[in-house]
Swiss-Prot record:
GO terms for cellular component: chromatin; Cul3-RING ubiquitin ligase complex; cytoplasm; cytosol; focal adhesion; membrane; nucleoplasm. Ubiquitinated by a BCR (BTB-CUL3-RBX1) E3 ubiquitin ligase complex, leading to its degradation. Deubiquitinated by USP7. Substrate-recognition component of a BCR (BTB-CUL3-RBX1) E3 ubiquitin ligase complex that terminates RNA polymerase II (Pol II) transcription in the promoter-proximal region of genes. The BCR(ARMC5) complex provides a quality checkpoint during transcription elongation by driving premature transcription termination of transcripts that are unfavorably configured for transcriptional elongation: the BCR(ARMC5) complex acts by mediating ubiquitination of Pol II subunit POLR2A phosphorylated at 'Ser-5' of the C-terminal domain (CTD), leading to POLR2A degradation. GO terms for biological process: adrenal cortex development; anatomical structure morphogenesis; CD4-positive, alpha-beta T cell differentiation; defense response to virus; gastrulation; hemopoiesis; in utero embryonic development; mesoderm formation. Residues 82-112 have a biased composition (Low complexity). This is Armadillo repeat-containing protein 5. Residues 82-113, 467-498 are annotated as: Disordered. The keyword Ribonucleoprotein does not apply. GO terms for molecular function: ubiquitin-like ligase-substrate adaptor activity. It comes from Rattus norvegicus (Rat). The keyword Transferase does not apply.
């Protein structure tokens, strides 16, 4: 049997030649159109089914120049004649269409004279568009089609030929071309979007709709193009189709397109999607079994939250619960990465801007979710956004109580000095829709606003009806707090208008808007908490006070006046007095603001912004506020109760705080002296520290108390040595050491090393009862010329021999004293002191102790020497150490370091240290 003869259309060259010839013929050429279209149809069919679908067939077709005649053919066909009437719309096959030649009312009926040409044009267009769409799946073909002007003919076909199959292939070709940014811009410029939107509303075929939806999705490749699509009405038909999508494939295409169009959601996009009834279907699709559809629907809802106008409707449709549930799932143990949580976090925070959504969010467990975000160090970039969202609950008493119970206050305090999150700025359109921009001053107030204003006035947050405008919202106009006196006593005018607040930037709230930086939301919430009748449990704690003080002292410029008012409000509230005492808050205020030492600066100092004079004035003002509270009848009772009936920790804290906040002698004497507060504090020094800065606080407290006991005390000079060290007295022992001693020694003391030291028997016996009994009594040494001195080194014996022969201030006492920085325990100085006591030479002991003090406890000396001196165990030296530590004018840091050294040196034997410090504080040291 003979092999089948190959057809001419099997040759790509033949097909391209026929295509080129057809593209070069104008409408109404010399040949029979029917014959031409039939032959051309066979060529196009062969190109589509054999040549294009072959391996690398598209590239060969492009390389052989097939795209140019193909585009020319489309251009010729698009201009071949009038578009088929709307009655010919549909995807019915030609046989069905031609069967309707009999007259009748059927919509598809046409005369035979007008049917054949459009049908042939349709077949040509179908095949040519199919080939072009297939070719445009490759980047090189897309670029060439754009270069040869192939976009405009497609737009013309889309406009003129209203047949579903042709619209389908045209939209598919445009969608493929739109994958290139340059082609996408050209398609927009050619005006294709309105025709795609028109086809979207008129078409009924699912495949055609999917192609149009895909084309619109690919055309939304940039913010400008997405906005253009929304402004030309592309979103509403998509939303309307979503509610009636006949099959899952179309639903998937619609959701993907809406996801792309809603990125950076514009007002027009949100309006159209809402008006098209798309919110309800999107909420329903959030539980779709197919993951891609489900996640896309959730992200569309998250994108829509950027527009305030649609958020209330979104909440009514159930979007709040959907977004919270998805965010909770993604943050769970098997959740996804932080990047996938970001749009949901942003959406949930934006939902907090409307009251109706805040209520839904609170009831759905959103507060716990937001608190979890704040407590997560890995979510630190979102913390500023979350805090700003919580401002929406500013006047929701129930929500605030719940947030406080969940630990919001310390998180807010930490937020004041945290790292700035990388959050984009929200546009005006994201503002709360509770107060829309369209509101005018002449618009009558709604009942809800009147109720809000009446509540604010009744609760004391507004003094009168004019204090709050209907256009107020936390995001755009932070409510200024009323100017208030920082002192509860009207007579103290200096405390009512402190210079500190004026210097640090306080301005009258009624005349100038308060600054609203990154710290603004946190401060606004803290201010709201501080206005509670008793805010001590939340705000007068170590973390909260540290956060506020770190912000005030660490701000590069003037701090927000609201932070200063919070501190003033807390110190003026009698309900906070006990909390300030228990938490060492008063001591912290003095250390941080007045002395300039923060917890981070102890014991190693760190560089910080310096505004010491302003911070000092602020600290003194706050302590004065606490003094007013402490010296009131309520404060006296509270302090007395703490000192007598409080826990051991509270009693110590009260004793430590009294010198800072009590100035009345009768009060502090009763608390510290009569009721044992001072001895309690001194005893606690050698116990485990209840606060990281306890020893610093204690040293400062003892110094303040010393100033209260002796108000006119001046720096105490160190006792002078009997003889000036700079000009020592003549040495009386030196003549005995020369080659011709005069007078001649009548005995020698022999040391363990064999060294013999000359001495006078009479002088030695007269200087010490020990040597009087040894050398003049009935001991054998009284008859010996070589008297052994056991257990004595030459360096320790040297000051003893000098002292026995009358030397006072000759410098011999300095010999065994090591220089500062070297240990005294086990040194020659300790041995010399022991020898002076052993030989009953109290004057020598005093001289040696004074020498130790002169060298190791000089005013220029370091605090590390204080503990070394105390370790010698000498009462006079212990008093000297206490006096150096609490000396008026001493550097607070040195004082605290010295006290730390004393406590370490004392160990468990607290008695000597307690007595030494008590004597110095009370001014009764001998």
């Amino acid at each position: 049997m003979a092999a089948a003869r190959p057809a001419l259309t099997d040759s790509l060259s033949f097909c391209l030649a026929q295509l080129t010839a057809a593209a070069g013929e104008g409408p109404g050429g010399g040949k029979d159109p029917a014959t031409n279209e039939t032959a051309l149809g066979r060529v196009l069919l062969a190109l589509r089914t054999r040549h294009i679908k072959a391996a690398e067939g598209i590239e060969r077709f492009r390389a052989r120049g097939g795209l140019r005649p193909l585009v020319a053919l489309l251009r010729r066909t698009a201009a071949a004649g009038p578009a088929p009437s709307q009655a010919a719309s549909g995807s019915a096959p030609p046989s069905v269409a031609s069967a309707g030649s009999s007259p009748g009312p059927a919509p598809a009926a046409e005369s035979p004279l007008t049917l054949s040409a459009p049908m042939r044009l349709r077949k040509t267009l179908d095949l040519a568009l199919s080939i072009l769409a297939n070719c445009c799946t490759e980047g090189a073909c897309r670029s060439e089609v754009r270069r040869i002007g192939g976009i405009l003919p497609l737009v013309t076909i889309l406009q003129c030929v209203r047949i579903d199959s042709i619209q389908n292939r045209t939209a598919r070709a445009l969608g493929n071309l739109a994958m290139e940014p340059e082609s996408c811009g050209d398609i927009h410029s050619a005006g294709a979007v309105p025709f795609l939107v028109e086809s979207l509303t008129a078409c009924q075929d699912s495949q055609c709709l999917q192609s149009i939806v895909r084309a619109l999705r690919n055309l939304a490749d940039s913010p400008q193009h997405r906005l253009a699509l929304a402004q030309q009405g592309a979103v509403r038909p998509l939303a309307e189709l979503l509610a009636t999508a006949p099959d899952p494939a179309l639903t998937s295409a619609l959701v993907r397109a809406l996801l792309e169009l809603s990125r950076g959601c514009s007002r027009a996009c949100a309006e159209q999607l809402s008006l098209g009834g798309g919110l309800g279907p999107l909420v329903s699709l959030a539980s779709h079994p197919k993951r891609a559809i489900r996640e896309a629907a959730i992200l569309i809802l998250a994108n829509l939250c950027a527009q305030g106008l649609v958020r209330p409707a979104l909440g009514n449709a159930g979007g709040v619960e959907v977004l919270l549930g998805e965010l909770r799932r993604r943050r769970g143990p098997s959740g996804s990465s932080s990047a996938s949580q970001q749009p949901l976090v942003r959406a949930v925070c934006l939902l907090c801007r409307e009251a109706i959504n805040r209520a839904r969010l609170r009831d759905a467990g959103g507060l716990e979710l937001l608190m979890g975000l704040l407590q997560d160090p890995g979510a630190s970039a979102w913390h500023p956004r979350v805090v700003a969202a919580l401002v929406g609950f500013l006047y929701d008493t129930g929500a605030l109580g719940k947030l406080q119970a969940l630990g919001l206050v310390p998180l807010l305090a930490r937020q004041l000095c945290g790292e700035a999150g990388e959050e984009e700025e929200e546009g005006v359109e994201a503002a709360s829709w509770d107060f829309p921009e369209e509101r005018t001053s002449g618009q009558p107030e709604g009942g809800s606003f009147r109720s809000l204003r009446l509540w604010l006035i009744s609760e004391g947050y507004a003094a009168g009806p004019g204090d709050i405008s209907p256009d107020w919202s936390p995001e755009r106009c932070p409510m200024p707090e009323p100017s208030e006196s920082v002192s509860p006593t009207p007579g103290q005018t200096s405390m009512s208008t402190p210079r500190t607040l004026r210097k640090l930037g306080r301005v009258p709230a009624a005349t100038t808007e308060e600054p609203w930086g990154q710290e603004g939301p946190a401060l606004l919430l803290l201010s709201r908490f501080s206005q509670a009748p008793d805010p001590s449990g939340a705000l007068v704690t170590g973390p909260a006070l540290c956060g506020l003080l770190a912000y005030v002292t660490g701000a590069p410029g003037p701090p927000n006046p609201r932070a200063l008012r919070i501190l003033a409000r807390l110190t003026c509230n009698p309900a906070c007095l006990e909390a300030f005492v228990r938490s060492y808050g008063a001591a912290l205020l003095r250390a941080w603001l007045v002395l300039g030492v923060s917890p981070d600066d102890w014991p190693v100092p760190h560089a910080r912004p310096v505004h010491r004079s302003q911070h000092r004035e602020l600290g003194e003002m706050l302590l004065q506020n606490l003094t007013v509270q402490a010296e009131s009848p309520f404060g006296v009772g509270a302090l007395t109760h703490l000192l007598l009936s409080g826990s051991p920790e509270d009693r110590v804290a009260c004793a430590l705080t009294v010198p800072f906040i009590c100035r009345k002698p009768t009060l502090w004497r009763r608390l510290l002296l009569d009721q044992g507060g001072l001895r309690l504090l001194l005893t606690a020094l050698t116990q485990p520290a209840p606060h990281p800065l306890f020893l610093f606080f204690a040293a400062d407290s003892l110094s303040c108390l010393q100033g209260l006991v002796s108000p006119s005390a001046s720096p105490v000079p160190l006792p002078d040595l009997p003889l000036e060290l700079d000009s020592p007295s003549p040495c009386l022992y030196k003549p005995l050491l020369g080659p011709a001693p005069a007078p001649a020694p009548d005995l020698h003391f022999v040391l363990d090393s064999g060294l013999q030291l000359p001495a006078q028997r009479a002088a030695s016996a007269a200087a010490s009862p020990f040597f009087r009994a040894l050398l003049s009594g009935s001991f054998a040494e009284a008859q010996m010329n070589l008297v052994p001195l056991r257990g004595l080194s030459p360096s320790a014996a040297w000051p003893v021999l000098h002292h026995l022969h009358g030397c006072r201030g000759c410098g011999a006492a300095l010999g065994p004293i090591p220089p500062p920085g070297q240990p005294l325990l086990g040194s020659k100085a300790e041995e010399a002191l022991e020898a002076a006591g052993r030989f009953l030479l109290p004057a020598l002991e005093e001289e040696l102790e004074e020498a130790v003090g002169r060298i190791h406890l000089s005013p220029q000396g370091g605090p590390e020497s204080v503990g070394e001196v105390f370790r010698l165990g000498r009462p006079r030296l212990a008093a000297h150490c206490a006096r150096w530590t609490l000396e008026p004018g001493q550097c607070p840091r040195k004082r605290a370091l010295a006290l730390t050294g004393l406590v370490e040196a004392a160990g468990e034997e607290a008695g000597p240290l307690t007595e030494a410090l008590l004597a110095v504080v009370m001014g009764v040291e001998s």
